[in-house]
Regions:
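Conserved structural motif at the start of ABC-family nucleotide-binding domains
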Residues: 2, 17-19, 72
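The feature captures the beta-strand-to-loop junction immediately N-terminal to the Walker
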Residues: 33-35
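Helix-to-loop junction immediately C-terminal to a conserved catalytic motif
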Residues: 48
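Conserved ABC transporter NBD signature motif
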Residues: 56-71
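Conserved ABC ATPase "signature" region
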Residues: 95, 99, 107-125
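A short, proline-enriched helix->beta-strand linker immediately N-terminal to the Walker B motif
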Residues: 148-152
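Catalytic Walker B motif of ABC-type/P-loop ATPase nucleotide-binding domains
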Residues: 154-158
Length: 169
């Protein structure tokens, strides 16, 4: 469960996030819709402790994200391609992410099988660095890496950006 309490973030005079109290329960699926600059990505970055709040806090399963990192073991996220290590190949990157979660190479390979259709033969085995992939294929690599360890909590910011229509189903 995610609990947001008195959460505020300002950039100069602009209030980007101002949430008094909000709870997201296990099993909930939530989508945020808003104009550019409305604070959606800022909220995700606050939840993931990538930005420091001006006021308030976020807890995930009763763990204050700004004070303890235990929540990271059961959380997967992809916000943008800045999350990717672009001097690796996708295979190297997936193995790196897997290793962070205690997965062996064989386990990573097994967990990639369900994503083969999503990758559409365009990601694996191409012998090129992530930086040389299209924005859509970088998006696929990020989404897959966020899901690789079967997280309890998954946070994706604009997951359909750059994806071909056939990849969105």
């Amino acid at each position: 469960m995610i609990e947001i309490n008195q959460l505020q973030k300002n950039f100069g005079e602009k209030k980007a996030v101002d949430i008094e109290k909000y709870s997201i329960y296990q099993g909930d699926m939530l989508g945020l819709v808003g104009n550019n600059g409305a604070g959606k990505t800022t909220l995700f970055r606050l939840i993931l402790d990538l930005l420091q709040a001006d006021l308030g806090n976020v807890t995930i399963n009763d763990i204050d994200v700004s004070k303890n990192e235990d929540w990271k073991q059961f959380t997967g996220a992809f916000i943008d391609d800045g999350f990717l290590i672009d001097y690796l190949t996708p295979e190297e990157y997936f193995y790196f992410i897997g290793k962070m979660y205690g997965l062996k190479k064989e386990e990573v390979d097994e967990r990639l099988v369900p994503f083969e259709r999503f990758m559409n033969g365009e990601v694996m085995g191409q012998k090129k660095l992530i930086r040389n992939y299209s924005a859509g294929n970088k998006q696929k690599i990020g989404i897959i890496s966020a899901m690789l360890h079967y997280p309890q909590l998954l946070i994706l910011d604009e997951p359909f950006n750059f994806l071909d229509p056939s990849s969105q189903s």
